[in-house]
From Swiss-Prot:
Main location, first listed in the record: secreted
Cited CDD domains: AmyAc_CMD, E_set_CDase_PDE_N
Protein name (Swiss-Prot/TrEMBL): Neopullulanase 1
Source organism phylogeny: Bacteria, Bacillati, Bacillota, Bacilli, Bacillales
Gene: tvaI
EC number annotated for this UniProt entry: 3.2.1.135
Cofactor note: Binds 3 Ca(2+) ions per subunit.
Catalytic activity field: Hydrolysis of pullulan to panose (6-alpha-D-glucosylmaltose)
C-alpha cells in the first residue's frame, strides 16, 4: 500500500515550524486502502500496553494498541462503564513506533473512577473497521470477552511471581515416626487404620479402607525437606492439602479446625514450619497456603458427632444441640445435606449474613480463617475446597448466597492481611468469582491449563480418557480461557499438571518422560502460577484416587534425575525474567502438521520467544521474532541449552527436539 502522512492542522504545522530544531515524531498514517492488517494488531494488559493494570479508583488508565506502521487511519477505545451502564468512546492518538520501525503504537486514556469497566478497540482504515478485545481481532463488534478494568482489585504480587509446590502431607516425608498412625490405632465408622511401608501400594489390604491407609508423612517431614523445595527446585510457595484433625488420610473430613492432626504433629509444629518457610536461611522467602475445607465438616466433628465421641451433644444427636442449625436436616437425624451425597461429609449451613457459621469460619476475631492468618501462625493464604458449593439451607452453591459468602470472606481475610491469597477450587470457568474483584484472587485452573495441556500433549483428558486436540485448537482454548479473567487473575491462576483429584500427568503420557519435559517447559513459561504436585517434577505416575497420592520417592529427588534438573533450570529462568510472569503473551506459530506451538512473552525490558515441539521427532522452526520487535542482527539465547542465534530477516531458525522446547531470550 502507498503510505501517506496524515494532513496536519494549521496549529500543528505552526508548532512544527517553531520547533524545527527538535525531533518531532510524525505518525505514519495510512493511505485509505480500506484494509486493517490483523497480523499487526496487538494489545493486552502487559507493561507495554497498560500503565495501570491494577489501578486505584483515582488512577486513570492509559492504554496502547499496536498496529503495523502506517496501516490505520484512526482507532478508538470503546468501554462500558458500570457506573452508568453505558458505552463511552475515547479517540486514540498516535504515540510512537517500535524500535524496529515495524509497528505504530496508538494510545488513549480512560479517566479514573471507582467503577468497573470493560473495553475493546475499534480500528479503522478508511471504510474498513476491525475490532480487538480479549479474544483477539474480529471483523464484527464482539459482545463478550472484553478487557477488564477493576479499580482497587489487587492480587498478591508474590502469588503472580512465585512457583507453587503442592504437598499431600501423609505421602511426602516422615520426619517424626513417633506420631505415625499404626495399624489399628483407631477405627472410623467401624474400619481400623492401616499403616503401610513407605513406597508400598496405596491401596488398602482386605478388611481396611483406602482412606484409612497411612504412610507417616507429617509437617516435620515437610520442614526437613524445605531445602529440596526452596533450594534444589526453587519453588517458594507451599500449598498443603488439609492438615487439621480428621480421621482419614486426606483430612477433608475435618474434626477440629483449630488443631493440627496428631499424625502430622501439633500446632507448635505448624508454627515452626511456617517460620522456616518464611525464612531465607534455607532458600528464598517462602509462603504457605492452607486448604480451607469450609463447605462441610466430617461427621465426627463435635458439631455433628455422629458416633457419640464427645460429651457434648452434636447436631446428629440432638435437635437441641447448640450446633443443630450449623447443618441442614431434611429428616433428622439421618437425612441431611452433604457434600455430593457423601454422608460422612455433612454440609455446613451458612444461613444469613451474621450467622454463627459465618462467624466461626471467617467473621469472628477467633474464626478459623483469621486465627491462622494472624500470629503466631501468619499463613499467607487459603485455598478454598469445594468453593462453589458453599451455601445456606442445604443449597448447592453457585448462587447469590454463595457469592455473598465469598465476598464477606474476602473482606474478613483482606482485613487481616491485604496481601493474603484467596484461591477457589473450581473446575470450570471461575469468572463469576473473580471478575468483580470482590471474591477470589484466582482459582484452580483445570479448565484453562490442566485440561488443554493434557489433551494436547498426552492425547488424554485429566482423568485419562482419550481426548486429543490440535495445536490450533490448543491455542484457541488457551486464548478463550484467558479472556475469561482479569489479567491479574490470569497471572495468579493455579496451573498444575496433576493434583490429588486427577490422574498423574506421567501416567496420562504413558510414562514418556519427554512429554513431561515439554509440559514443564510450557508450565514455567505460560501465564499463571506454576504449581507442581509433589513428584510431578520427577515423573511420578499414578492413576485415579488414591493412586495419585503415592509416597514420594526420595531417590529421584536430585538433579541427577533429568526432569528434576529441568524443573530447577526452568524455575531459575522464570525467576530471572519478569516477562515470563507478568509480561504480555502473544501467539507466534500454530503448526498443526508439525505440532509446533510458539509464543512470545515480553515486557518493556525483555523479549522471549518460546518454541514447543509436540511431535516425536525434531523439527527446524523459523520463529517470527519480528512480531516481538527483535531487531535484525541481534542475538537471542536459548536459556535451556545456552545456544545463541542471530535474528535474520525478522526470523530466528532453531532446531527443537521432539517433545521438547526452546526459550529464546534477549
Amino acid at each position: 500500500m502507498i503510505k501517506l502522512l496524515k494532513p496536519m492542522s494549521l496549529s500543528i504545522l505552526l508548532v512544527f515550524i517553531l520547533s524545527f530544531s527538535f525531533p518531532f515524531p510524525t505518525a505514519k498514517a495510512a493511505a485509505n486502502d480500506n484494509n486493517v492488517e490483523w497480523n499487526g494488531l496487538f494489545h493486552d494488559q502487559g507493561p507495554l500496553f497498560d500503565n495501570a493494570p491494577e489501578p486505584t479508583s483515582t488512577q486513570s488508565v492509559t492504554l496502547k494498541l499496536r498496529t503495523f506502521k502506517g496501516d490505520i487511519t484512526s482507532a478508538n477505545i470503546k468501554y462500558w462503564d458500570t457506573a452508568d451502564n453505558a458505552f463511552h468512546w475515547v479517540p486514540m492518538v498516535w504515540d510512537s513506533n517500535d524500535p524496529t520501525g515495524t509497528f505504530d503504537y496508538w494510545k488513549g486514556t480512560i479517566p479514573a473512577s471507582p467503577s468497573i469497566k470493560y473495553y475493546r478497540f475499534q480500528i479503522n482504515d478508511g471504510t474498513s473497521t476491525a475490532w480487538y478485545n480479549g479474544n483477539g481481532p474480529s471483523s464484527t463488534e464482539p459482545n463478550a470477552d472484553d478487557f477488564y478494568i477493576i479499580p482497587n482489585f489487587k492480587t498478591p504480587d508474590w502469588l503472580k511471581n512465585g512457583v507453587m509446590y503442592q504437598i499431600f502431607p501423609d505421602r511426602f516425608y516422615n520426619g517424626d515416626s513417633s506420631n505415625d498412625v499404626q495399624t489399628g490405632s483407631y477405627t472410623y465408622n467401624g474400619t481400623p487404620t492401616e499403616k503401610k511401608a513407605w513406597g508400598s501400594s496405596v491401596y488398602a489390604d482386605p478388611g481396611y479402607d483406602n482412606s484409612l491407609v497411612f504412610f507417616g508423612g507429617d509437617l516435620a517431614g515437610i520442614d526437613q525437606k524445605l531445602g529440596y523445595i526452596k533450594k534444589t527446585l526453587g519453588a517458594n510457595i507451599l500449598y498443603l492439602n488439609p492438615i487439621f484433625k480428621a480421621p482419614t488420610n486426606h483430612k477433608y473430613d475435618t474434626q477440629d479446625y483449630m488443631a493440627v492432626d496428631p499424625a502430622f504433629g501439633d500446632n507448635s509444629t505448624l508454627q515452626t514450619l511456617i517460620n522456616d518457610i518464611h525464612s531465607t536461611a534455607n532458600g528464598p522467602k517462602g509462603y504457605l497456603i492452607l486448604d480451607g475445607v469450609f463447605n462441610h465438616t466430617g461427621d465426627s466433628h463435635p458439631w455433628f458427632d455422629k458416633y457419640n465421641n464427645f460429651s457434648s451433644q452434636g447436631a446428629y444427636e440432638s435437635q437441641s444441640s447448640p450446633w443443630y442449625n450449623y447443618y441442614t436436616f431434611y429428616t433428622w437425624p439421618d437425612s441431611y445435606a452433604s457434600f455430593l451425597g457423601f454422608n460422612s461429609l455433612p454440609k455446613l449451613n451458612y444461613g444469613n449474613s451474621g450467622s454463627a457459621v459465618r462467624g466461626v469460619i471467617y467473621n469472628n476475631s477467633n474464626s478459623v480463617a483469621k486465627t491462622y492468618l494472624n500470629p503466631p501462625y501468619s499463613v499467607d493464604g487459603w485455598r478454598l475446597d469445594a468453593a462453589q458449593y458453599v451455601d445456606a439451607n442445604g443449597n448447592n452453591g453457585s448462587d447469590v448466597t454463595n457469592h455473598q459468602i465469598w465476598s464477606e470472606f474476602r473482606n474478613a481475610v483482606k482485613g487481616v492481611n491485604s496481601n493474603a491469597a484467596i484461591i477457589g477450587e473450581y473446575w470450570g470457568n471461575a469468572n463469576p468469582w473473580t471478575a468483580q474483584g470482590n471474591q477470589w484472587d484466582a482459582a484452580t485452573n483445570f479448565d484453562g491449563f490442566t485440561q488443554p495441556v493434557s489433551e494436547w500433549i498426552t492425547g488424554k483428558d485429566y482423568q485419562n480418557n482419550s481426548a486429543s486436540i490440535s495445536t490450533t485448537q490448543f491455542d484457541s482454548w488457551l486464548r478463550g480461557t484467558r479472556a475469561n479473567y482479569p489479567t491479574n487473575v490470569q497471572q495468579s491462576m493455579m496451573n498444575f499438571l496433576s493434583n490429588h483429584d486427577i490422574t498423574r500427568f506421567a501416567t496420562r503420557s504413558g510414562g514418556d518422560l519427554w512429554k513431561t519435559y515439554l509440559a514443564l517447559i510450557f508450565q514455567m513459561t505460560y501465564v499463571g502460577t506454576p504449581t507442581i504436585y509433589y513428584g510431578d517434577e520427577y515423573g511420578m505416575q499414578g492413576g485415579a484416587d488414591p493412586d495419585n497420592r503415592r509416597s514420594f520417592d526420595w531417590s529421584q529427588a536430585t538433579p541427577s534425575n533429568s526432569a528434576v534438573a529441568l524443573t530447577q533450570k526452568l524455575i531459575t529462568i522464570r525467576n530471572q525474567y519478569p516477562a515470563l510472569r507478568t509480561g504480555s503473551f502473544m501467539t507466534l506459530i500454530t503448526d498443526d502438521t508439525n505440532k509446533i506451538y510458539s509464543y512470545g512473552r515480553f515486557d518493556n525490558v525483555n523479549r522471549i520467544a518460546v518454541v514447543l515441539n509436540n511431535d516425536s521427532v525434531s523439527h527446524t522452526v523459523n520463529v517470527p521474532v519480528w512480531q516481538l520487535s527483535m531487531p535484525n542482527g541481534s542475538t537471542v539465547t536459548d536459556k535451556i541449552t545456552g545456544h545463541s542465534y542471530t535474528v535474520q530477516n525478522g526470523m530466528v531458525t532453531v532446531a527443537v527436539d521432539g517433545h521438547y522446547g526452546a526459550v529464546l531470550a534477549q
